[in-house]
Amino acid sequence: MSKEEIWDKVLELAKNELTPISYSTWFEPPKTELIDIQENTAIILVESNFVQDFLKKQYTDIIADLIEKAIGTKLMPNFVIQEDLTEDKQVKDSAKAKSEAKPDVQAPQNSSEDQFNVHNTFETFVIGPGNRFPHAASLAVAEAPAKAYNPLFIYGGVGLGKTHLMHAIGHYVLENNRDAKVIYTSSEKFTNEFIKSIRDNETEQFREKYRNIDVLLIDDIQFIQNKEQTQEEFFHTFNDLHQTGKQIVISSDRPPKEIAKLEDRLRSRFEWGLIVDITPPDYETRMAILQKKLEEEDVDIPLESLTYIANQIQSNIRELEGALTRVIAYSRLQNEAITTELTAEALKDIIQTPKSKKITIQDIQKVVGQYYNVRLEDFAAKKRTKSIAYPRQIAMYLSRELTDFSLPKIGEEFGGRDHTTVIHAHMKIQTDMSEDPIFKQEVENLEKEIRNQ
């Protein structure tokens, strides 16, 4: 596979996994280019020093993971600008340094702060009504591992601060106990390492790595659904850590009861401690997040421009910060002062003005009803024939995915059904989608149609 083919594949994955703002701002061609692969390093050419610094801080691990998904081999990215390439030796030295600095996958990373983003601390976390309780719980766990809440299970949508809190816990524990053994990983990395340990006959080393620690922080646990062997291994890892008084912190995009194809014994253990959810930030919190980001960037932006960003991007902190970074980058590259007009111009490809119509449950029922030939009134009726009940479950699933309405409110819009019925419908459709690619595509097409109304 050529460098161009590899990078095309990485960009295709990035487009699916990153937010539209992040992808179009930093990676959309021709903003990045894979120019060389040396030992364990991918040399990636970017446009400017500003972009280089930002990608190094925010995207090194993400791009490494995407490269591994694309080609099956983990390469650490080294972001370079044209000036770095004046002498080929510079690139080679850089690649060598990167390779030598990279720890072996089985080597203990337990007490290394390199696992954590230096910016993701409790001090930089902006507290608001939607995250106050998760922040307090995370701080309590960091101050007294395995004494407060064990496990701590944090769930919420993409880009709301779950990973920030997990990194903050790691930083705090290590700052207060340099001998502590802390591992932060994702369920996907855990799975990949487990598979590799079986293939290489190194399961004992794998278990030593994950069980001889003080704190385990595991992100995106929902991705172990359907992975029976991984669930079995994680079950025993969980038990070993919990029984020996070690702290476990887990994050997910949904609560344990809504993770389909998860063993009941694992679901039960996830519910042993404290479950907290992070919700989208309100206007005041969004403004505070933008102000905090400005302090980090040491940039002044007119209040009107900040207000514009906060009003246009409401549900995702990552997209909110990405929008601000895009505006700053656009201003610097255009050599223009930041104004409301420039802000709107910088974000015109990302947000719609006037603001997009908010999706309602009635919108969802209308689209699903038209597709499956179900009358609107039948969504609220007591009829249980499959030709009506199944489209009703699909509409409930989409209502949970595409709106911010509570479970009781969704149930109310479907004839006063109980919130447990909504949960069951969501899990049922989620399971069916995971088992049937054609049905999954069908539901995704419905979602696109609803969003594009």
Curated annotation (Swiss-Prot):
The entry lists its GO molecular-function terms as:
ATP binding; ATP hydrolysis activity; DNA replication origin binding; lipid binding
- In the UniProt record, the gene name given for this protein reads dnaA
Pfam families tied to this protein:
Bac_DnaA, Bac_DnaA_C, DnaA_N
UniProt entry keywords in alphabetical sequence: ATP-binding, Cytoplasm, DNA replication, DNA-binding, Lipid-binding, Nucleotide-binding
Keyword Cytoplasm assigned to the entry: answer is yes
The entry's function note states: Plays an essential role in the initiation and regulation of chromosomal replication. ATP-DnaA binds to the origin of replication (oriC) to initiate formation of the DNA replication initiation complex once per cell cycle. Binds the DnaA box (a 9 base pair repeat at the origin) and separates the double-stranded (ds)DNA. Forms a right-handed helical filament on oriC DNA; dsDNA binds to the exterior of the filament while single-stranded (ss)DNA is stabiized in the filament's interior.
Q: Could you state one GO biological process linked to this protein?
A: DNA replication initiation
Residue positions binding ATP: G159, G161, K162, T163
Q: Where is the composition biased (Basic and acidic residues)?
A: 91-103
Give the species this sequence originates from.
Staphylococcus carnosus (strain TM300)
Q: What is this protein called?
A: Chromosomal replication initiator protein DnaA
